[in-house]
Amino acid sequence: MKLGSSALSGLAVVLLGCAALQPVAAEEKAAVESAGPLLWQPSMNVFRRFAVEPEEMFKFYGDALGLEQLQTFDVGGGTNVARFRAGRSEVKFTRRVPDRTYVPGAVDEATGLRLLTFFYPDRDQVVERFVAAGYDAPVFEEVPGTDRLSALVYDPDGHAVEIVIAPNAPQELYDTIEVGLTVSDLDVSRAFYREFVGLEELPPQDDPRFDTQKYSFKHGTTIVTLRSFGADLPADTGTGGIQYVVTDVEAIDRLAKERGVTIDQPLSELRGFALRTIWLDDPDGITNYFAQTGASRRAAAAQ
């Protein structure tokens, strides 16, 4: 399977963006204080771009991590979008695109989307899957003050993945995905995710694995966690990003312009598909992509 770098269909655009998108004018509607009230899907999705053979990524995330592989979208032009279910979220994969920077490696080596965390009830099952898939067994450490275990591994493209074993936890935790962002300025980034995106801010926590504090924000079964290791790290703006499904993307466009948020790809419509989109950058250039689908639009109209 060969993956390309441009998207030509609805759900693929959620991941990639597309030059075929046509600008649309924003209608005058009531102002919103943040994107929070417009979030329709009770989770967020995440995407990662890669340079290795796609089968290597599929083996790691499917066979070893145990994520359910969903239909891969063939969007034409030799372009495909691979999708995996992680609880109520989707993790999506595509080839790298130009005009973005890529810095594989550890969580503290660059700003950007640096870590994905998945939660499991049973250590032995995880180890068995890794070994059966031909990988070394993850090395788990105790999480101080809890009954949990944690292991840090790297996917075939050099991206960090944390595996947390949490026995006897509520099912909601096993449906949760934690998206770890390394940022250059915690105060600025916290304000962005709290005040612009409108996520629920959780109390800060000590993070013994990375010897720092982490600041987390929650929406449904997705947690966005911020860490900082200084202001002088190189910026990885291409490896990954976050996608939100909203009821009114035009309101997001107006809010972004009002707040001075960087717009990477402007408010657009994919002709032939019930999809309107806008791509924004957070203060470190990490993609925050907002999509209004036919389903979310109909849900808003029915209210």
What feature does the model see in each segment?
Residues 53-54, 120-124, 185-186, 246-249:
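Helix N-cap motif at beta-to-alpha junctions
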Residues 49, 117-119, 180-182, 243-245:
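Short hydrophobic/aromatic beta-strand micro-patches
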Residues 9-20:
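Bacterial N-terminal signal peptides
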Residues 30-32, 99-104, 226-227, 298-299:
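A short, acidic/glycine-rich surface segment
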Residues 47-91, 148, 180-223:
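Core segments of cupin and vicinal oxygen chelate
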Residues 35-50, 56-143:
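Ordered, small/hydrophobic-rich secondary-structure cores
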Residues 1-11:
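Bacterial N-terminal signal peptides that target proteins for export
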